[in-house]
Structure formats: C-alpha cells, structure tokens
C-alpha cells in the first residue's frame, strides 16, 4: 500500500481563523471504498460543534462546522460529486453535471449512506467518513481528482473556509482548480 503524509488544509485569506486552529486530512482507498479522516487541532471550546442528530441526509450542513469532499474523474469531465459530513452525524451528497449545475439525471440518485464517526479530543476533534466512491474503478478508469475541505465555525466568530488549495479570491470549494489531489485507480492509497 502506498503511503503519503497527512495533508494540511489552509484557511482562505478572506476568512482568517480568529483562534489558533489547524485542519489535516488523511485518506485511504481500497477498491471503491474511500475512508477520510479530518483532524481539527484547536481548543475544543473555541469551535462550534453541531449537536448530535439522527444519522441521515440533510441540507445546509456547510452553514456550520462540517467536512467536505469534492470528487471527479481525472479525465477532464466537468461532472463531480460533493459530499458533506457533519459532526452531528448527518451527511449530504450532491451530484453536479458542471460547476454548480446540479445533475438531475436518474443516475444521480443518492449513493450508499456513508458511515460517520465523530470523536472529541482533548486538543480538538476528528471525524472519520467511509464512503463508496461515486464512480467505481474499472480497467480503463483514469482515477479521481479530489478537493478536500472544511468549514469551521468558531465560537462567537465567523465561519472559516479550509481547503487543500484555494484557486479564487473568495472561498469557492466548487471551483475545479481546488480539486487538486490525484487519487489513482490502479493502486490502493493510504495517507494516515
């Protein structure tokens, strides 16, 4: 299994964190199963963590602390899938035919429900999400390009927008220039 260092997300300069804060992501892929681990390092009291809710799909998760993955085929196609994972246990999945253009085709049905596990820590928290990739690998699969992001709500403060790469002057996780991580289809990968 190939190894990588966990990936540090950076806060967008237009939304600086008002408290000391760091966000890292690790990932592991085996077949069509992708496991993502977000680790927030901060004084736990300085972050607003959504209260537990029944597990299931929900909209508007990005309005509070949540973790996101944008996944597209690495073949130049404009279509992609957005996943949102909340510490509350709720999640969302949206498919797009192009940037911010929702896909209404029958094939855009919801995937299998992801499995989420949120764990408060003495110096922050972590969230693990296990999901089935929206486009399973086959012999001719080009692999994926992924944007890994986080929205962090600070206590008494604004939202901070974190990503592997910010290609625009304002936070925009849908921008294809932010989907910079290449995930090969021909071999497993582990970065935590």
Regions found by a protein language model. Name each.
Residues 1-53, 60, 165-192:
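Order/disorder boundary and secretion-linked terminal/linker segments
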Residues 3, 58-78, 140-192:
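Acidic/polar low-complexity flexible segments
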Residues 12, 23-27, 111-122:
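Beta-strand-rich interaction surfaces with strong enrichment in secreted/lumenal proteins
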Residues 22, 33, 64-68, 80, ...:
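Extracellular structured ligand-interaction cores
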Residues 27-29, 40-44, 73, 133-135, ...:
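Beta-strand elements of well-folded, non-transmembrane domains
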Residues 56-117:
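Extracellular/luminal beta-rich ligand-recognition
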Residues 123-137:
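Localized edge beta-strand/strand-to-loop motifs within extracellular or lumenal beta-rich domains
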């Amino acid at each position: 299994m190939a190894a990588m260092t966990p990936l540090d997300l950076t806060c967008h300069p237009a939304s600086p964190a008002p408290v000391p804060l760091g966000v890292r992501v690790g990932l592991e892929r085996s077949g069509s199963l992708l496991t993502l681990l977000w680790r927030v390092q901060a004084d736990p009291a300085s972050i607003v963590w959504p209260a537990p809710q029944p597990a299931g799909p929900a909209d508007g998760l990005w309005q509070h602390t949540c973790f996101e993955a944008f996944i597209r085929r690495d073949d130049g196609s404009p279509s992609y899938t957005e996943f949102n994972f909340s510490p509350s246990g709720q999640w969302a999945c949206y498919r797009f035919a192009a940037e911010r253009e929702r896909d209404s085709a029958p094939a855009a049905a919801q995937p299998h429900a992801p499995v989420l596990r949120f764990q408060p820590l003495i110096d922050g928290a972590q969230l693990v999400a296990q999901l089935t990739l929206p486009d399973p690998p086959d012999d001719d699969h080009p692999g994926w390009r992924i944007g890994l992001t986080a929205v962090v709500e600070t206590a008494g403060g604004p939202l901070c927008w974190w990503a592997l790469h910010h290609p625009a002057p304002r936070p925009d996780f849908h921008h294809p220039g932010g989907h910079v991580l290449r995930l090969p289809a021909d071999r497993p990968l582990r970065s935590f």
